Regions:
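Short proline/glycine- and acidic-rich turn/helix-capping motifs at secondary-structure junctions
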Residues: 50-59, 96-98, 134-144
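Short, structured patches in soluble enzyme cores that scaffold and shape functional sites
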Residues: 22, 68, 107, 134-139
Length: 158
C-alpha cells in the first residue's frame, strides 16, 4: 500500500508467479499428469526481471517482465505441446508466438495509480536473480491453488 496504491493480489491469495497458459475451463485431473511429468524433467530455472510494464487494457495492470531465455521459452513451448496433444488450447495471448511472460504485481488499479505503481517497481530491488522452482495449476478469481510440483533435474539411472 505504498503511496496509497493498493493491489488486491495479496488479499485474494495470489503469490508471485508467471502464467504460462490460461484457460477458460480445464479439468484439473486431465492436466495433472502432464504437469507432474514436465516438472520431473526440468531443473529450476534461473530468472532475472529486466523490465516493468503495463498492458493496454481497461483495468490497470502492472507487471515485471523476466529476461526471456531459451529455457523459459522451452518450458512454455513444451507445456503447450503437451496440452495441445490433449486437445486443450490455451487462451490465444498465452500461446507460443503471442505470449508476453510477466509477473503481475498489481491489478485493477485506477488509471491514475498506474504510473506511480510503475515508478515504485522501477525503483525497487526486484531486478535481481531468482529461481522458477515449481509448476502448478491455479484457479483464478478467486485464487485457489489446485496443485503444484517442484521442478527438479531428471536423474538418469546408472
Amino acid at each position: 500500500a505504498r503511496q496509497g496504491i493498493r493491489s488486491p493480489l495479496p488479499q485474494i491469495g495470489s503469490r508471485p508467479h508467471i502464467s504460462i497458459a490460461v484457460f477458460d475451463r480445464v479439468d484439473p485431473a486431465r492436466v495433472r499428469p502432464e504437469l507432474e511429468e514436465l516438472a520431473a524433467t526440468l531443473a529450476p530455472l534461473p530468472l532475472t526481471f529486466g523490465a516493468v510494464g503495463t498492458f493496454p487494457a481497461k483495468e490497470g495492470v502492472v507487471f515485471l517482465t523476466p529476461v526471456v531465455t531459451p529455457e523459459l521459452l522451452e518450458l512454455h513451448q513444451s507445456l503447450h505441446a503437451r496440452l495441445d496433444a490433449l486437445g486443450l488450447r490455451a487462451l490465444e495471448h498465452y500461446r507460443p508466438g503471442r505470449w508476453v511472460p510477466h509477473c503481475t504485481v498489481a491489478i485493477d488499479l485506477p488509471r491514475e495509480q498506474v504510473i506511480p505503481a510503475l515508478e515504485i517497481c522501477r525503483c525497487s530491488r526486484v531486478f535481481g536473480s531468482l529461481m522458477l522452482a515449481e509448476i502448478g495449476l491455479v484457479e483464478y478469481r478467486p485464487v485457489r491453488p489446485i496443485y503444484s510440483f517442484p521442478l527438479r533435474e531428471l536423474r538418469l539411472e546408472s
